[in-house]
A protein has these predicted regions:
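Acidic, surface-exposed loops and disordered segments
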Residues: 1-432
Length: 432
């Protein structure tokens, strides 16, 4: 691979051992320009913050949520063989896993210059995987750069105090010079995917919270087992757990890249997620500005989406849950979807493989929609017991203040990549 006009640190990244990233991973929070004013680790940096370069930022973003080619999909289930298993929501794979290939999340990020959306959820293969070696990194980064959508001209503002962020992060999170990644999950869409999975495997739902069966499912007893339905609370816990794994492994993948690059940073969950989405109730702290609703039945506000940017698969962005289910089916089986015959793929006969998946029938979608609409009407939102839009983990990347670690720690507090970062990535700052 040619590394045209790139700093020598890029070649270090390409040769960095995975084992060293795994065992060298640490939360390194102290950035250039930071200060701890008191206590046993008191220290104030002598240096100004240095923002990530475009190349540094793109490497972190593509490590956290980059497209890695075509998803191979789940290949067989005896229940509907010889049809291809048709769970997946996306045709492309990313650097992190998603339950059954649902892929319902996207990554927002903010830096000194603005706030952005990094859209890779439904991207086609941006990486040309061949038997000849790794793909051309310049081409990969350029393809991913085109997936960035700028939403504002400034860093997201959040007061460095409780209740907006946990007190132990108030001195280090979202600081000048940092890039903060915010994976956001469409839990409404994820729950639709879970309901489809249930019907595909013969399971029905019942409302264990209110002690009710779901009226109308009796018409679909040939599709689902009404004698042994699964509890709503369990299945919504199932959905949020799967979504959490997606958001967290996204951050973890980016965290490994920080070690290879010699950047500081850490993955954490210590910023209030309702504040992040814009549901803090404080008009002075709009953050991402998602729509949210309140209801006396809910202990917390419920974010549903950011219009035209990231809209949840639920009202008000769809008139009802039947329309949301239809939209999810179109994502799967429509143009560009994993089960559309014209979508390219990794197989020698991709059209034959993709078209072998059984398309959701009208009665299948009706069965899913009856359960989804019941939840929406009974609880006033969808899903009923968990948020429609979900945020949990974040990843921050910044330039490390080595003097803090040299002052307070013994040898080995940071990796050689950290020690050499400025000379290998920013040699102009080391001159003179």
């Amino acid at each position: 691979m040619e590394t045209r006009a790139h700093p020598p640190g890029l070649q270090d990244v390409l040769q960095f051992p995975l084992v060293e990233a795994l065992y060298g991973r640490r939360a390194r929070r102290f950035s250039l320009g930071a200060s701890i004013p008191d206590g046993p680790l008191e220290f104030t940096s002598r240096h100004e913050p240095i923002p990530l370069s475009d190349l540094e930022q793109m490497l972190v973003l593509t490590a956290a949520a980059g497209n890695t080619g075509w998803h191979y999909m789940i290949t067989r289930h005896a229940r509907y063989a010889p049809h291809l298993s048709n769970y997946s929501g996306a045709a492309g794979g990313r650097t992190f896993p998603s339950a059954a290939g649902f892929h319902t999340s996207e990554v927002f990020f903010t830096d000194d210059e603005g706030t952005y959306l990094f859209e890779t959820r439904d991207a086609p293969a941006l990486v040309d995987q061949t038997a000849d070696g790794p793909p051309d990194l310049d081409a990969v980064l350029e393809a991913h750069r085109s997936r960035i959508r700028k939403l504002s001209e400034s860093r997201l503002h959040i007061p460095a105090e409780e209740p907006y962020m946990e007190g132990h992060n108030s001195w280090c999170a979202n600081r000048p010079g940092s890039t903060l990644l915010i994976p956001v999950g469409d839990l409404a869409q994820h729950m639709i995917a879970v309901l489809c999975f249930m019907v595909q495997n013969g399971y029905a739902l019942y409302d264990d919270i209110n002690g009710d069966q779901i009226s109308g499912l009796e018409r679909y007893s040939h599709l689902v087992n009404l004698e042994e339905p699964l509890p709503l609370s369990f299945m919504e816990t199932y959905a949020i757990t799967e979504c959490t794994a997606e958001l967290s492994t996204c951050c973890y993948a980016g965290m490994l890249m920080l070690q290879a690059m010699g950047l500081g940073g850490w993955m954490f969950d210590g910023i209030d997620r309702y504040t992040v989405l814009g549901a803090s109730g404080d008009p002075e702290v709009p953050w991402l500005g998602f729509r949210y609703d309140t209801d006396e039945r809910w202990p917390l506000p419920n974010p549903t989406g950011l219009e035209g940017v990231f809209e949840g698969y639920c009202p008000p962005y769809y008139p009802d849950m039947r329309a949301a289910v239809e939209a999810f089916a179109d994502r799967k089986f429509g143009p560009g979807g994993p089960f559309h015959p014209d979508t390219p793929g990794p197989w020698k006969e991709s059209t034959r493989v993709r078209s072998s998946a059984q398309v959701h029938s009208e009665e299948f979608k009706e069965c899913v929609a009856i359960m989804a609409q019941y939840i929406y009407e009974r609880f006033g939102k969808f899903p009923g017991t968990v948020p429609s839009i979900f945020v949990l983990t974040y990843l921050q990347a910044h330039h490390l203040e080595l003097e803090f670690y040299d002052h307070h720690f013994g040898p080995g507090a940071y990796l050689k990549t950290h020690a050499d970062h400025m000379s290998r990535w920013h040699p102009e700052r080391c001159e003179g």
